[in-house]
């Protein structure tokens, strides 16, 4: 597995550049800072990998100000996170879907890699997953996707979708949808969908 080969670093989760990963996390954190309720908030990190987002949260928030639950379908990273990062207020689970409702449901890179699947099936999976997660969201659902005018899955199994496809789906089915873009991540957009 990639985790066994590379250990707890971005390479093991297909994010080859730590700087780019931090940029992704910082978009999410900036949005949470602007919109977080007074008092403690709860975050579900779906597709948490080796726990990088939790570390970034702890760099930006007092650990008493939030509770964190990380979810992943890969056993090795979850075992690693449970050994190294689990504490009161930060738990990790071998599961693809959160166990309870959270203020923020975060998916950083969760939907970008899809081996052995056609685009139409992946898109159906993406939208079905967003529906499920929206029902477990109190304030906002935040996720990033690879964007292109040509919707496709590459030979490296990376999924690209049109920005308008995502925005239209989210506005029609969920709520106000904000987009965050950086020239340093030219093919990605972070979407923040808010409950009113």
Can you annotate each of these PLM segments?
Residues 44, 52-92:
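Class I SAM-dependent methyltransferase SAM/SAH-binding core
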Residues 39-49:
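Conserved class I S-adenosyl-L-methionine
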């Amino acid at each position: 597995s990639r985790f066994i080969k590379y250990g707890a670093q971005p390479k093991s989760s297909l994010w080859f550049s730590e700087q780019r990963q931090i940029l992704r996390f910082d978009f999410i954190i900036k949005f949470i800072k602007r919109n977080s309720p007074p008092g403690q908030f709860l975050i579900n990190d779906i597709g948490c990998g080796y726990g990088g987002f939790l570390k970034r949260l702890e760099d930006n928030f007092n650990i008493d100000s939030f509770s964190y639950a990380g979810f992943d379908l890969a056993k090795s990273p979850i075992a690693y996170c449970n050994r190294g990062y689990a504490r009161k207020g930060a738990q990790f689970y071998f599961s693809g879907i959160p166990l309870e409702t959270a203020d923020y449901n975060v998916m950083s890179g969760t939907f970008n890699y899809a081996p052995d699947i056609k685009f139409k099936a992946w898109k159906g999976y993406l939208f079905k997953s967003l529906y499920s997660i929206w029902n477990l969201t109190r304030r906002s659902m935040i996720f990033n996707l690879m964007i292109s005018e040509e919707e496709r899955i590459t030979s490296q199994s990376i999924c690209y979708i049109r920005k308008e496809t995502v925005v239209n789906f989210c506005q029609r089915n969920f709520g106000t949808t904000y987009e965050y873009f950086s020239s340093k991540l030219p093919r990605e957009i972070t979407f923040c969908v808010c409950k009113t």
